């Protein structure tokens, strides 16, 4: 069984990513609501995005302050 396509198409949408420890949290902003998903691991992204996710700390139910 060869040919492993993880979610490379996912990056085509307007998504933002933030590296928290060893997990990458990606979330998409929709007109109705915002969805948060954590799947990627070991990656580096701009700190600006991390600042935005801090405001949504309550939504995710985790404390990212210790990482910033």
Swiss-Prot record:
This is Uncharacterized protein C03C10.5.
